[in-house]
Amino acid sequence: MSPVGKRLPKEVITLIKTQKSSYKEIQDNVERLWKIRIPKSTISYYRRQRARTKAIDLEAVSREDWDWFQGLFSADGNKTLNRGNYGKHYIIRISLSMNDDPAIAKKCMRILRTIGPKPMIVPCGNCIQVRVSSKNLYFALKKQPSSDGVSPAYVAGAIDGDGTVDHHAIQFGQSRVPELFDGIALFFRRSSTPVSTWSTKNNYRRMYIPYQTLKKTLVLSFSLRAQRIRQSLGRERGDYSDGAGEI
């Protein structure tokens, strides 16, 4: 018998967690290899601590949807690693406005369900959180964009997360992830459509992105927030066309 209160050798714990056998077979193997007779309750305890890693399929969604989700996470998401009695929990959260962003939350939920994890929406005061637990997704998501540049869909996701409609433009502000702000500014410069940027007194940087710039760079095609400008222009003109083409 293993002495009461004494932790089992690491090799024994690894065998319990990895061997796909009956409790009786595990008991016999441990006794044969280490001369320790362990109770079934001990096997049950360590088996509950096995990593519950569920597969995700990033190929199940379009490249544009995945880029959009990454941009949204970079702007308005966070991830935490919680250690509980039964192992680690890899939590991803996207925080959105309860009044203004239900369509964004709906798109976010659709993408997550298609990839594989089971997300849920949690009310938090005036906000809603899209929350999901997934080890694979936890490591796939980064707050900083790729140094190789970002796509129109990625910029659209960031705008949907941290942008605001300002008449016929989007104002985007970002202070916590300077690489995101820099990456979006670089995207517009590379598209030959530079945007106005400035800093407030507390070094909070802001960016002003006109509607025509959003349209020219195709960001408009993917941003739910930017599409509100199109709808506003349509109401102002009485239609979604100005007679010379689509707004």
Regions found by a protein language model. Give the residues of each.
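Internal intein/HINT superfamily modules and their associated LAGLIDADG
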Residues: M1-I247
